[in-house]
Amino acid sequence: MVIRGDNITVDFAGATLQGTPADTAIRIDGGKNVRIIQARARGYKVGILARGTRNLTLEDNDLSYNWKPRLFSLVEHESLVDWLSFHHNEKDEWLRFGAAIYLADVAGGKIVENGAVQGMNGLLLVRSNGLSIRGNNFSFNSGLGVGLYRSSYDTIVHNWIDYNVRGYSHGFYSRGQDSADLLIYEQSSHNVIAHNSLTHGGDGVFLWAGQTTMDSGTGGANDNLINENDVSYATANGVEATFSRNTITNNRAWGNEYGVWGGYSFETQIVGNDFTNNRFGVAIEHGRDNVISGNRFLHDSVAIKLWADSIEPSDWGYPKHHDTKSRDYRISGNTFVDNHVVLEARNTTGLDTLAAASPPSLSPPHFSAPTTPLSLRDRSAIVVDEWGPYDWQSPKLWPVDSTRAVPLRLAVLGPPGTWRVVSQRGIATLSKTSGRMGDTLAVTPAKDSTGDWEVMLEYKGQQFSYGRFEPPIRWTADSKSLPRVDFFSYRPGHWSLQATGTVTLSPGFYTLRAISNNAMRLYLDDKLVIDAWTPHESKVDYAEMPAGQHTLRVEYNQTDGWIELRVEIIRGRPEQYTLP
């Protein structure tokens, strides 16, 4: 649907638009005083796209379950394929990621009580100013809840923007892969971010001055107010605010890697926040003239860390235009309780710490933001599968430990209730055949299952399952056997591999999937089927794999940095995995 003109209200009255991934459900071209209310859109790359509209109102629209990409990180280790980059959007590069709502050059209006869950991105603003964004639910997306690019004077208050995350596996890795509940990028200034729930994201708030500032040293994402938000349980940072000047006050930051990461921040106020059970409460490198005052630091490993490195990246323009010494901090009136280290400072001058601490108090600072039972859980509630974050609204089986463990322990996740086993294949034993949600089910695959097994459960009439399809490939390299070709590590040097494997597949349709960086070739029965020998960043390639007995050969050569190589056989034809 395309909408053009002024003073238009389109009330969908709950009607649903059902589309395909390449499409946009509703497009608004220019105009003023345009209202879209009670629309439902499913299956689109973009739900609502507006350009150049003045005084736009989007109210009570449900734009959930639209496009999102498959993820390739595993329980045991991540994949670099899944890392995001939002650094450039001058030519609508962000549209490649899709969005429930994408607003470009929109001036004024309100975005109220909309929902966008289980997609990749919720709301993206590009050069869009003066918007009031209130009472929305942009949660459980695999990229961003809300993203701003060159967007200023917007007010984002009283929203639920939780669990926008990827790149996390509890007990194995905590990377985030540049996902975030709220992203503020590239000269986005004078925004008010207040009273929001921003929990369990890659970051809670991810603010970066932008490439313009990095190159020229000018501008920044400055004078934003981040006040009374819950930025807890992020995989990385509750608030990341870099190369800019901002005010961060009265927020709750519990259980993050970093409560506030403020690299190269200047004249920034960090006041009245509650930092509890973080690895670092506040960490700032190369910052200057910052204030850290009236905060509570409780059970953080390191409460405050300030430092400067002797060498800065040579390709950054920013240090050539700014004094980037770590200097001139005012640290006063903070409460420190049971922190391993209170203040760690290195290569830092001008520290005013005479009044750094107040008498200890266990009472948290005043705080007001929306909460839900899920927003109060710790990071163990973050479960990310190949389609993004799990929302706890439906039943799910998920490994408690490594997927290689035998027996394999599976957590039965979901709302309260009971479950029962309705079918099983390729399994020797199950620890139980019925129980309650929250149980752990131990599965021992049969020795003759050849890596092909599944257990299916039922909860209130809904079936859900967990299984494995991993045909045994007898790999050898340098006359040594390999259990699988799955390598992921960082090591300087020039590592290489040549491995040969044999496999037998029963009748059916199969696909070879290779995930690689650097340089890789894959041969099937001595025929080159995937040629990725030109040095490249991590990517995914597919090739058709016939049934029967076959020989595979993979060649890999590291050119720099990270090593990522994974070769696997999956069910189905390649086109099933390469659709947009």
Could you say what each language-model-derived stretch is?
Residues 20-29, 47, 57-104, 110-113, ...:
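Acidic/polar low-complexity surface segments
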Residues 1-16, 30-33:
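Beta-solenoid repeat scaffold
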Residues 10, 34-35, 159, 191, ...:
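Short, well-structured beta-strand segments within conserved domains
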Residues 444, 454-511, 515-580:
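Extracellular/secretory pathway-exposed regions associated with glycan biology
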Residues 31, 53, 106, 128, ...:
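A generic structural motif
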Residues 375-480:
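Long, low-hydrophobicity ectodomains and other hydrophilic envelope-associated domains
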Residues 8, 34, 56, 109, ...:
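Short beta-strand/loop motifs in extracellular/secreted proteins, especially
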Residues 12-15, 39, 61:
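Extracellular beta-strand-rich, repetitive "passenger/adhesive" scaffolds
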